[in-house]
């Protein structure tokens, strides 16, 4: 029996990686993305991603679970298309939106850390029948503005209280919470009488909360 050895974890310290990045002198992009999907083997998924991304000098903090992936990353700009190809190997990430940071910091991440977790975003739900792939309708900006003008619409801000306090849409429900899992029972209670007769519109920072 042949045993194959694969590098599935970091071998460099953050300090060593920072020196390598500076010496390379190449522009890096900071980006984030997420996707909900039914992952049969999260550990294998994690290992496959590490091998593919380590080869592209991709760094970042990534969580994978049986419900999908949530990633914040730094990659060399010249490897962007190759990186996208590693995503599109998976049907659920074909055409995925990569959110690029407004300002790019070459040292935003100094290790490639991919962790297998129970969930990609903690929600406090213990419901095996909950289907993360059964999502609502994504609205473009024009559609969002139009539905906000409908008096039959209820708007929910799924961000933390310190974000909604800075600014939020008019008449939005803004739970006084610090975590997503805290907001769910509060919002569910407030909306229980309107689930069938109102337009329920939700927004959050990156989409991962309100999509769930």
Language model segments and positions:
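Cytosolic catalytic domains that perform sulfur/thiol-centered chemistry
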Residues: 3-212
């Amino acid at each position: 029996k042949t045993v194959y050895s694969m590098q599935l974890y970091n071998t460099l310290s953050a300090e060593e990686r920072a020196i390598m990045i500076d010496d390379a002198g190449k522009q890096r992009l900071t980006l984030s993305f997420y996707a909900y999907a039914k992952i049969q083997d999260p550990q294998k998924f994690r290992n496959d991603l590490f091998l593919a991304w380590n080869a592209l000098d991709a760094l970042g903090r990534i969580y994978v679970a049986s419900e999908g992936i949530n990633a914040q990353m730094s990659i060399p700009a010249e490897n962007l298309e190759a990186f996208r190809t590693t995503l599109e190997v998976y049907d659920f990430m074909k055409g995925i939106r990569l959110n690029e940071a407004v300002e790019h910091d070459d040292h935003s991440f100094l290790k490639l850390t991919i962790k297998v977790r129970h969930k990609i975003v903690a929600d406090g739900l213990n419901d095996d029948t909950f289907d993360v792939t059964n999502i609502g309708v994504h609205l473009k900006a024009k559609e969002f503005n139009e539905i906000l003008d409908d008096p039959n619409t209820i708007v929910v801000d799924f961000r933390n209280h310190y974000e909604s306090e800075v600014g939020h849409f008019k008449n939005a429900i803004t739970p006084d919470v610090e975590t997503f899992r805290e907001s769910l029972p509060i919002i569910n209670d407030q909306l229980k009488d309107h689930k069938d007769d109102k337009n329920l519109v939700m927004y959050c920072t990156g989409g991962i909360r309100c999509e769930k």
